[in-house]
């Protein structure tokens, strides 16, 4: 990146690792979002070293809950908000709630 050999970075964050996902992930919401925040902080650090914003792409995928798919979407929105609040130095409030999984589907 610092040598100019990389033009942008893709952050691939899959919701299937979340503890409420039907695939049985083991990462709770707080830790899952800390991953997003750590990426955003790293991107800001690299941007400071470059003297310009590092172009980033957030690739949000996965999430296989059949009982409440909106919780999967809300989890992805939480990740976008966590990253954008850090990268763009903003304070968009996150009021989304992730419902606990009601039963195992698989």
Language-model regions: role of each:
Residues 1-106:
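A general "terminal functional-core" signal
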């Amino acid at each position: 990146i610092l040598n100019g050999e990389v033009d942008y970075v893709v952050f691939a964050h899959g919701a299937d690792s979340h503890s409420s996902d039907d695939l049985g992930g083991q990462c709770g919401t707080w830790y899952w979002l800390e991953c997003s925040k750590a990426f955003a902080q790293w991107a800001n650090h690299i941007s400071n070293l470059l003297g310009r914003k590092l172009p980033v792409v957030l690739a949000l995928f996965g999430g296989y809950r059949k009982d409440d798919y909106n919780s999967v979407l809300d989890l992805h929105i939480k990740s976008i908000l966590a990253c954008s609040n850090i990268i763009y130095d903003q304070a968009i409030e996150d009021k989304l709630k992730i419902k606990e999984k009601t039963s195992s589907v698989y």
